[in-house]
Amino acid sequence: PITVPVGALVRVHVLNMVEYDPVASFHLHAQTFDVFRTGTSTVPGEHTDTVTLTQGERAILEFRLPERGRYMFHPHQHHMADAGAMGWFSAV
């Protein structure tokens, strides 16, 4: 797991570098996040629990985990998740 302090700002840089798939997503369980799409603004354009990126697209996600525990993340493309593209944030 990726360990973070409870309540601390977490910033995740995500990008879709998958050549054989037109889209990839990032979904966070039990928490939502602000989405800063690259090159668009210094103000988040979305607040959600899932972001979908096209090939070559990238974004910065920001959130805080308010409670101790494990928060699962994964793509909604099952073949990517089955190949290991999933994990946990552990808030301590």
Feature names for model-found ranges:
Residues 1-92:
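Copper-binding active sites and cupredoxin-like electron-transfer domains
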